[in-house]
């Protein structure tokens, strides 16, 4: 049974509220990452198991946030835990190469034909930062084309927003980003081939960086032929195509969005799933490009925690499981949940829409968006009220209208049916 709801204040969140008050005095906004600053205050998780979270007040939740994507097997997967524990017994950081990073590199490359060489880093942000440096170093060009609303981490070249017009030179999206940096990033709308063509017309673009599926405003899916069109245009203008698959990698398919949509990138960034819930990122691509990365070439990239043995062990264990056909079952459950929500929205005659692919999903409080500007028209406050109703019912969705929800291997039909019961009850408003 789902829990009843009156308001956020009816939940016992006393410990979380107290922790948040302490945290606000110690950390900016009381959190270590802005997305965690749930209004009016976040709940503090104490432990997790399978598809469930338990907070400091003893409340339990079915988790569809899944740490914003990495926990595709659910929490505390026994096989992953065993491999991590075995590695910790041997030591957890050496500052030397290990067999594990060779094995994980081989495994990833076996699933991604577009990746011939790979560099492991510690985060998705580091991966995209390195990808842009590699693209600029390889092509000798400075300009980058970025999709409006696409998220690629928290470094200067991608913390850029559009000015006015369909194709615009970017302006800083954060204080502290130099205007001289932002001017080298050109913004174009997603799903707009003409805007992409115009952006590359000057032939001074090093690369287009994009999420094949926009994960931080939805998800918003590519229209038929869009990714193929971007691939064609970049080739015509000698620009590299970077697919940021930090979210979609090993989620849409074992070969990620490139396998699912049958479009290959020149450079690919990965993260989240390939670390099994531990810090990781990776950038890979064609051999002729990646051979330019130090120490083999002159494009510098380095990091103390690159190739962390614990992350490598967790990543290998995760891929071992996904390769057994588990990913197909996860994606089947994703289809089942999306259809269930769509049926509820239709039965209730709501002006909402359901988006998603594979194990990604979202309810938009408005029409189905095709790009960032359309996504912004959704009812954000209405979604926040819905979020709290669902949380009171024991279901943790991502707290923003513009964050993707996820399904894991731990979410079975019974759990999803309980979730649909809550959706039916609380989408009524």
UniProtKB/Swiss-Prot annotation:
GO annotation, cellular component aspect: cytoplasm
Superkingdom: Archaea
Name of the gene encoding the protein in the UniProt record: hemL
CDD domains (UniProt xref): OAT_like
Protein's name in the database: Glutamate-1-semialdehyde 2,1-aminomutase
Family to which the UniProt record says this protein belongs: Belongs to the class-III pyridoxal-phosphate-dependent aminotransferase family. HemL subfamily.
Originating organism: Methanothrix thermoacetophila (strain DSM 6194 / JCM 14653 / NBRC 101360 / PT) (Methanosaeta thermophila)
Modification sites for N6-(pyridoxal phosphate)lysine: 272
Localization in the cell: Cytoplasm
GO biological process per UniProt: protoporphyrinogen IX biosynthetic process
Catalytic activity, as annotated: (S)-4-amino-5-oxopentanoate = 5-aminolevulinate
EC number: 5.4.3.8
Pathway field: Porphyrin-containing compound metabolism; protoporphyrin-IX biosynthesis; 5-aminolevulinate from L-glutamyl-tRNA(Glu): step 2/2
């Amino acid at each position: 049974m789902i829990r009843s709801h009156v308001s956020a204040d009816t939940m016992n969140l006393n410990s979380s509220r107290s922790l948040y008050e302490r945290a606000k005095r110690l950390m900016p906004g009381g959190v270590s990452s802005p997305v965690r600053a749930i209004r009016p205050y976040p709940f503090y998780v104490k432990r997790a198991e399978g598809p469930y979270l338990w907070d400091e007040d003893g409340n339990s939740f079915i988790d569809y946030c899944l740490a914003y994507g990495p926990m595709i097997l659910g929490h505390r997967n026994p096989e992953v835990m065993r491999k991590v524990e075995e590695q910790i017994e041997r030591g957890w950081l050496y500052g030397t190469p290990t067999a594990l990073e060779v094995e994980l590199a081989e495994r990833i490359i076996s699933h991604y034909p577009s990746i011939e060489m790979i560099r492991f880093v510690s985060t998705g942000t580091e991966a995209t930062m390195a990808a842009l440096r590699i693209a600029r170093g390889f092509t000798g060009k400075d300009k980058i084309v970025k999709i409006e609303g696409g998220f690629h981490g928290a470094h200067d070249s991608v913390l850029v927003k559009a000015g006015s017009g369909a194709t615009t030179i970017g302006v800083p999206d954060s204080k502290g980003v130099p205007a001289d940096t932002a001017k080298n990033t050109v913004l174009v709308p997603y799903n707009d081939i003409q805007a992409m063509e115009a952006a590359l017309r000057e032939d001074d673009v090093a690369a287009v960086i994009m999420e094949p599926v926009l994960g931080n405003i939805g998800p918003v899916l590519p229209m038929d032929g869009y990714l193929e069109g971007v691939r064609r245009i970049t080739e015509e203008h000698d620009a590299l195509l970077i697919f940021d698959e930090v979210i979609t990698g090993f989620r849409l398919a074992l070969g990620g969005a490139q396998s699912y949509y049958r479009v290959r990138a020149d450079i690919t960034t990965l993260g989240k799933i390939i670390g099994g819930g531990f810090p990781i990122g990776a950038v890979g691509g064609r051999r002729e490009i990646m051979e330019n990365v130090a120490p083999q070439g002159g494009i510098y990239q380095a990091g103390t925690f690159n190739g962390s043995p614990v992350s490598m062990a967790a990543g290998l264990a995760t891929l071992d499981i996904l390769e057994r056909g588990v990913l197909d079952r996860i994606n089947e459950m994703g289809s089942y949940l999306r259809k269930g929500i769509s049926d509820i929205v239709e039965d209730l005659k709501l002006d909402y829409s359901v988006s998603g692919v594979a194990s990604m999903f979202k309810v938009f409080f408005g029409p189905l968006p095709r790009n960032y500007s359309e996504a912004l028209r959704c009812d954000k406050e209405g979604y926040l009220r819905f979020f709290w109703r669902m949380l009171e019912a024991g279901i943790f969705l991502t707290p923003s209208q513009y964050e993707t929800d996820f399904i894991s291997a731990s979410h079975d039909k019974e759990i999803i049916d309980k979730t649909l019961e809550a959706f039916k009850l609380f989408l009524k408003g």
